[in-house]
Design a protein with these regions (language model features):
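Catalytic loop of short-chain dehydrogenase/reductase
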Residues: 91-95, 102-114, 140-165, 170-179, ...
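Conserved glycine-rich cofactor-binding loop
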Residues: 7, 14-16
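Short C-terminal tail/terminal secondary-structure segment
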Residues: 151, 211, 229, 240-253
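Short, small/polar-rich loop/turn modules that mediate ligand/substrate recognition or access, typified
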Residues: 178, 183, 239-241
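A short, exposed helix-loop element centered on a Lys and neighboring polar residues
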Residues: 126-127, 171
């Protein structure tokens, strides 16, 4: 199914990387369900600017009940079920190596918070999408990961561990759901220049990453978002269970 014919849910789709993903999908002609938690102003602006393509829904994706409500509202609005899900939403986190919790300071609550935001949120959206995707014999799920799983140069223990679990879930879901025509993949990036999460990152860190990257620049949110289009397009119809790293070649998959 071409992107222009799809209804795509983007969780956290009104800020940072999520906004870049939403804008890329709008440009491709897709209908986009923009989920947001607190970015109401931007979400409603998007809906006003693209009334035929965008439907904005506030929901906490770590709540199963709210996710189910989100899917029901989107289906009622567009008259058709969601075809694809991009699990992008990030619970509160800043990429600031100096301020990160050290291993001896980690708590069960902090670890669980990141796990819920990464794995449970993806589980809930996948479960909510499943019945309609099975009936259609088509579905696309893209989970957003991190290259820190392969190369933890800064040990963000809670965040990286949660994303590693999400990668495992991506692979097990792909194995389970492929028989129904549902492809599940992950797209992993490094530090992006810039998003809300990377605003605390000092300039010298961006310079260091650029000098260490084969493309000699730090990947932008727009560049990362463009790679998602491949996983949603017919060109990747035989691709599932994969983790594509989009970081300019810093980490070799």
């Amino acid at each position: 199914m071409h992107i222009r014919d799809q209804i795509v849910l983007v969780t956290g789709g009104a800020r940072g990387l999520g906004l870049a993903i939403t804008q890329a999908l709008i440009a491709e002609g897709a209908k986009v369900v923009v989920n947001y938690h607190s970015s109401q102003h931007t979400a409603t602006q998007l809906m006003a600017q693209h009334p035929k393509q965008v439907f904005a829904v506030q929901a906490d994706v770590t709540s199963k009940a709210e996710v189910e409500r989100l899917f029901a509202q989107a289906k009622a609005h567009f008259g058709t079920a969601i075809h694809a899900v991009v699990n992008n939403a990030l619970v509160h986190f800043e990429f600031n190596g100096d301020a990160r919790p050290k291993l001896e300071d980690l708590t069960a609550e902090g670890m669980t918070h990141q796990f819920d935001g990464a794995v449970l949120a993806a589980l809930y959206t996948t479960q909510a999408a499943l019945a309609d995707m099975k009936q259609a014999g088509f579905g696309r799920i893209v989970n957003i990961g991190t290259n820190l799983v392969q190369n933890p140069v800064v040990p963000y223990h809670d965040y990286t561990t949660a994303k590693a679990a999400l990668l495992a879930f991506t692979r097990t879901a792909a194995q389970d759901l492929g028989q129904y025509g549902i492809n599940v993949n992950m797209l992993s990036g490094g530090l992006l220049q810039s998003t809300d999460a990377s605003k605390a990152t000092p300039d010298f860190v961006f310079d260091l990453i650029a000098s260490s990257t084969p493309l000699r620049r730090v990947t932008t949110p727009d560049e990362f978002a463009a790679a998602i289009l491949m996983f949603l397009s017919p060109y990747s119809r035989a691709v599932t269970g994969q983790n594509l790293i989009v970081d300019g070649g810093l980490v070799k998959g």
